[in-house]
Structure formats: structure tokens, C-alpha cells
Amino acid sequence: MIGYPIGISDQYNHKPVIRRGITATHPKKDYQGQKHILLDMACFPGSSGSPVFIMNQGSYATPSGITVGNRIYLLGILFGGPQYTAQGILSFANVPNIPKPIVNIPTNLGVAIKSSEILEFEKILDPTHEQ
């Protein structure tokens, strides 16, 4: 995945951050019945819109066996991910109620829309697109 997690980049060279992970669900199956893929990688705010690639160096598996060579394939575009909340307790002297802040904690999972769906946005973004 290539992007700017929580605004981080290589400012000196003007380059985004490249991270790696694995698919948490099979890329050819629709996650939760939608054209989505679940990813097991560090996905933080600022990563939405990042392209997610499959990159194989040296060899990769195909239905007919092992292919020697390199491959890069646009898998999808990250748009979100599950988070859970942790409630902490802050204590203040002489206060009858104890505030309980809710903190979102990333699960290091992300959800991407499949690359096959990218052109569907044309129907939404281009009012002159024939339907």
C-alpha cells in the first residue's frame, strides 16, 4: 500500500510511505458480500484512498503452477478499517461524576474496495456518463 498514514511521508524526497501486509480474505471472494477485501496491515487515518497492490518478486502461483518472474497488480483502494474502543477512567478530585473517554484503537486491519469497482465511480462523478 502506498500512502500517507497519519500524514507521514518522506518530505525530503517528496515521496509517500510504502507498507506491506497480506490479504486477510481471499482476493477473489467478496468480503461480507460486498466488492471489498480485508487486509492485514497497519492502516491508519490518512491511509484512505491509498492504492493497494499485490507484488510478487521472483515467482508467484497461478492455477497452472508456479510462474517465474515479477508481477504487480492493483488489488484495490483502501477506504477504512475496523476499530475497537477502549474506555479509560480519568479521576478528578471533588467531582461527583467520573468522565469515561472513548478511544478508538486500530486493529491493524483495513478494508479496500476491489479494483474491478473503480470505474463504477465514473457513473457517480461524471453526470454525462451513459448509463
Regions picked out by a protein language model, each given a short descriptive name:
Residues M1, T23, S48-V52, K114:
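Terminal peptide-recognition signature
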Residues M1-Q11:
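Short glycine/Trp-rich loop-beta-loop segment that forms part of the substrate-binding cleft
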Residues G3, T25-P27, I54, F79:
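A residue-level detector for short acidic-glycine micro-motifs
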Residues Q11-K15, I66-T67:
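Short consensus segments that form the blades of beta-propeller domains
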Residues N13-V17, H26-K35:
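Gly/Ser-enriched beta-turn/beta-hairpin loop segments
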Residues M41-I77, G88-A93:
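Catalytic nucleophile loop of clan PA
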Residues Q87-Q131:
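PDZ/PDZ-like groove recognition
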